[in-house]
């Protein structure tokens, strides 16, 4: 082969050797920008591990769980309890000076044990007429509970359900919007399952009781506001904070509000102000739950009804009334506690909000990762044919170690969530691809040299 032709072929091979890793780098950056589900899941797994390694330190906070636990069911009978018993519970909590009593149980059906229901079940015979009139004269259990709710700083819940289309729940507070309309950014649900109207009207607060997990079923984030059939409504957690502060309005701040920059072309929610508390959120109006690895210390519900408790344990606190009993607990997976009852998860959400220990993903994180990938990727592609695999391996390892260490420090010291996993994967992939290209090119040159010597000999 003529020398000039061999030189041209060698240059072409060199260009091809660069194009393959460059193509991989471009593809990796495009995937990072699009954020496919598998990449998102890898990042979430890293964040879960960080939370497990450094959970929130449990400190005294004004949140108290009152648990309708197995012991309470053994003492007072199986669920559902008559609503007059729930009314007594609400009264005891309120009279103990609680800042708010939050019912973490969906009460969507009338009490089947109420006198009015039982009275209507009696046969319409003359011998039952007197008994029927006496029973129907009594106040219904639902009305008794409604009276208790109206006397207390109470919060009741409705369930989010795309397949149910009850009347849209009425928001109990005002809503002020600053910046872009938040409706398009909030989690959307087609419908809801409402609480019994007489109870919903009596409560001071009314919010979505449902916990919304990520695609893998793990509850990592909690919404402050949701969109139900196009109507913005608060969650139970947001309402608990509002009622506890006797606040009357939510202020939701989105991009393009005064002093706020857009996350990009789609914009997003920046934060929600609830009374005196400013809650920084992600673009969908959610917070990351900062889990502690210690569960809350509940008070068994039967102790409140029997008077066997210290009222000071409830005074000035947000009291969550729910159940951890089997069949009632609505358990869901969490990053730190394993599978936990919804009641415990709700307590952790409120503790996160009150403690102010908010996890967040910095706006600049994605841009910084792309820039780092471009710079280090190009550097490795250029250096590998010149310095060799060993030196470039050291450079790559130092860069990956720095990314992992920096990510951990940002989490541990500043509560920032930045995953190094994709950066590390792409750098290793580019290193291996370019190393293979260099090796194959070197072997090709050796074959050509041996072939040339063979012709001379």
Predicted regions span which residues?
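Regulatory cytosolic signal-relay segments
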Residues: 423-457
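Active-site Gly/Thr loop motif
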Residues: 278-300
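Transmembrane alpha-helical segments that form the functional core of multipass membrane systems
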Residues: 359, 363-437
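Surface-exposed ligand/attachment interfaces on beta-rich extracellular proteins
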Residues: 303-311
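Hydrophobic residues in alpha-helical segments
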Residues: 304-305, 353-354, 411-412, 440
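Non-transmembrane functional regions of envelope-associated proteins
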Residues: 2-277, 311-391, 395
């Amino acid at each position: 082969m003529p020398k000039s032709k061999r030189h041209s072929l060698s240059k072409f091979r060199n260009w091809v050797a660069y194009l393959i890793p460059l193509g991989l780098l471009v593809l990796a950056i495009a995937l990072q920008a699009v954020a496919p589900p598998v990449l998102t899941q890898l990042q979430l797994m890293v964040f879960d591990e960080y939370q497990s390694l450094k959970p929130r330190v449990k400190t005294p906070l004004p949140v108290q769980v009152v648990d309708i636990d197995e012991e309470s069911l053994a003492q007072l009978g199986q669920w559902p309890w008559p609503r007059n018993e729930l009314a007594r519970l609400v009264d005891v909590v309120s009279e103990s000076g609680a800042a708010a009593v939050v019912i973490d149980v969906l009460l969507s059906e009338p009490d089947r044990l109420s006198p009015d229901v039982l009275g209507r079940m009696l046969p319409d015979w003359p011998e039952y007429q007197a008994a029927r009139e006496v029973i129907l004269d009594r106040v219904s259990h639902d009305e008794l509970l409604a009276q208790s709710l109206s006397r207390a700083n109470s919060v009741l819940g409705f369930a989010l359900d795309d397949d149910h289309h009850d009347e849209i729940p009425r928001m109990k507070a005002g809503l002020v919007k600053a910046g872009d309309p938040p409706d398009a950014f909030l989690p959307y649900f087609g419908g809801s399952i409402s609480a019994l109207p007489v109870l919903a009207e009596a409560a001071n607060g009314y919010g979505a009781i449902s916990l919304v997990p990520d695609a893998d079923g793990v509850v990592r984030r909690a919404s402050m506001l949701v969109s139900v059939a196009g109507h913005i409504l608060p969650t139970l957690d947001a309402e608990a904070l509002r009622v506890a502060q006797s606040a009357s309005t939510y202020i939701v701040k989105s991009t393009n509000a005064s002093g706020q920059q857009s996350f990009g072309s789609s914009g997003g929610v920046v934060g929600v102000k609830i009374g005196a508390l400013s809650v920084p959120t992600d673009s969908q109006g959610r917070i990351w739950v900062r889990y502690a690895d210690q569960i809350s210390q509940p008070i068994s519900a039967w102790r409140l009804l029997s008077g066997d408790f210290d009222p000071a344990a409830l005074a000035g606190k947000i009291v969550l009334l729910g159940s951890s009993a089997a069949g009632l607990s609505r358990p869901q997976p969490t990053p730190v506690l394993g599978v936990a009852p919804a009641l415990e998860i709700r307590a952790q959400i409120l503790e996160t909000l009150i403690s102010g220990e908010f996890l967040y993903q910095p706006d600049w994180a994605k841009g910084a990762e792309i820039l780092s990938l471009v710079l280090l990727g190009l550097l490795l592609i250029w250096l590998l044919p010149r310095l060799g695999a060993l030196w470039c391996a050291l450079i790559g390892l130092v860069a990956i170690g720095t990314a992992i260490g920096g990510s951990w420090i940002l989490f541990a010291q500043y509560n920032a969530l930045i995953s190094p996993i994709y950066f590390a994967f792409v750098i290793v992939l580019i290193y291996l691809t370019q190393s293979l290209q260099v090796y194959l090119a070197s072997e090709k040159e050796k074959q050509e040299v041996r072939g040339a010597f063979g012709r001379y000999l």
